[in-house]
Amino acid sequence: MSSAPAPGPAPASLTLWDEEDFQGRRCRLLSDCANVCERGGLPRVRSVKVENGVWVAFEYPDFQGQQFILEKGDYPRWSAWSGSSSHNSNQLLSFRPVLCANHNDSRVTLFEGDNFQGCKFDLVDDYPSLPSMGWASKDVGSLKVSSGAWVAYQYPGYRGYQYVLERDRHSGEFCTYGELGTQAHTGQLQSIRRVQH
């Protein structure tokens, strides 16, 4: 007598609307979308519902601009995804699922200098304030994601610009802060958390 294999995670999916509060035209995504205006026919995205998986949204087409982590749940307007970010975006134009968001096995190493040089700090848990946990600098020069997926923030308390860090992108290696995203103009990272799957 054989038992059925355990079901894997449901495929990533989210629904987008061109107006706040889940109104107007909508489009459902199951995979990467470099430009929702072209692929989904929406002029803009003003509300989002994540049904499965974890997604990263970008304010511009082709995965450019500010990044916003979208975990399972409802985002009825821009303030729901911008949160306490110092940069508010009232539109999202490209989306992709986050890879390897395994909350049970997450590990990242921060380095003071570029190319994995200088003092290092190994993390396996959420840190709302890196300085209060012993990280002496407000900047991170480089980092390696050994497992899982993380969101790093510019300021303590999970505020400011967001940077989604995945083991399966860049082989988990970010040699300089410029590799964190197109909006990364400084290496200032002061809080970090594991992606909630």
Swiss-Prot record:
It comes from the Eukaryota. GO terms for molecular function: identical protein binding; structural constituent of eye lens. Pfam families: Crystall. InterPro entries: Beta/Gamma-Crystallin, Beta/gamma_crystallin, G_crystallin-like. SMART domains: XTALbg (SM00247). Residues 1-11 are annotated as: N-terminal arm. Keywords: Cataract, Disease variant, Eye lens protein, Repeat. The keyword Cell inner membrane does not apply. The keyword Repeat applies. One of its GO terms (biological process) is visual perception. Residues 12-52, 53-99, 106-147, 148-196 form the Beta/gamma crystallin 'Greek key' domain. Residues 100-105 are annotated as: Connecting peptide. Transmembrane segments: none annotated. Crystallins are the dominant structural components of the vertebrate eye lens. Homo/heterodimer, or complexes of higher-order. The structure of beta-crystallin oligomers seems to be stabilized through interactions between the N-terminal arms. It is linked to Cataract 42: An opacification of the crystalline lens of the eye that frequently results in visual impairment or blindness. Opacities vary in morphology, are often confined to a portion of the lens, and may be static or progressive. In general, the more posteriorly located and dense an opacity, the greater the impact on visual function. Has a two-domain beta-structure, folded into four very similar Greek key motifs. Belongs to the beta/gamma-crystallin family. This is Beta-crystallin A2. It comes from Homo sapiens. The lineage of its organism: Eukaryota, Metazoa, Chordata, Craniata, Vertebrata.
